[in-house]
Amino acid sequence: MTIDTDSRATPAPPPQTLAQKLIARAAGRPHVMPGDIVNCQVDLAMFHDSSGPRRLKPMLDELGAPIWDRSRVVLVLDHYVPAQDEDARRIVGTARDWAREQRLPHVYDSIGICHVVLPEQGHLRPGMFCVGGDSHSPTGGAFGAYMFGIGATDMLGVMVKGALWVRVPQTIRMHWDGLLAPGVCAKDMMLHMIGRFGMNGGGYQAVEFAGPAVKALSMQERMTLSNMSAELGAQVGLVEPDETTWRWLAGRGVERVAGDWRSDPSAEAIVHRFDASTLEPQVAAPHSPANTEGVDNFAEVRIDVAYIGACTGAKLEDLRAAASVLRNRRVAAGVRLSVAPASAHDQRVAEEEGVMRVLRDAGADILPNSCGACAGYGGSIPDGANVISTTARNFRGRMGSPTAQVYLGSPYTVAASAISGYISDPRLVLA
């Protein structure tokens, strides 16, 4: 029997998740499957003063190798600025000197935290494959980019070759039905998921956030989801780009590009479902983001310090949320409220909107646009203090003092707690 091979139909490509499509593009393949190991071309590499030059410069000097493409490298000075001691001055000086030596075109010095500055400056768009020298680099996934954190050795390889191998992950879809109530936000969604699945629940796979509640979020709220996918143990935290994405990017000078950056309906994924309409404000107890329960379980916890800061919790949307609670109110006696806006741009807009005035009038101290206490730098958290913070992590000693008890909450919850002196439900203030 003769078979006419020319008449055979071409097999349809297998359905792909968003993560698979992003990796396939970077690998130059029509499709990839979970478990495949592929070599990906890097569109963008980002690092900061702590993770970058002081570690990369000696290794690059030893190799005698040039950077593969300076236009695809972004350096942000955010961890040790403003420098407060000799070690910090040395680290920051090394970064600045190396940036000049390498003639890097994209250097952002003391204007905010890298994960906020990067999209703010128009460096991200859907379809990109990016790496960052920081564990919260998955923030880029909010824009439909495949972005994750890598260490100095892997970053060295990227600097020289512009490529990196990855094992294609499975996709875990966190599907949120319903809509969030006033006073409940993306930070509460993330704390709830981390509390439910633990800090290894993501299994270094690709987490995709989906559903009506996610689509209703602003870009900066989506950034909070992707940012804290790191605390969920995921490699990346993706959100399907939509009109909200492109409108936000257009305001940063990013032109729309074509691409089918969404999961195919029949693509294989592990799906977990949640109802946003029933979610209450969440609080994580010391010393893990996984120690999460509803806010009412912490009503008797007195606080000494309320901190609104970090890439997770001090963006413009976060500052607005805190101000909505603090307006015409004062911080409780004996409580210190510190606010470190995540970027100079967001602080400037917040000034124009009157948000910063509300925070100051409530008694807040305004700190520089940097990682600050989240990175344990600056000695701003007293020993033995009870702290409620908008940061992403509350490991022992994370904010500097090994004896501080750090609780995590949303900007709404932190602000409400600051005015009552106890961990408090912001919905009671906003009602």
Regions found by a protein language model. Give the residues of each.
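Fe-S-dependent hydro-lyases/dehydratases of central metabolism
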Residues: 1-431
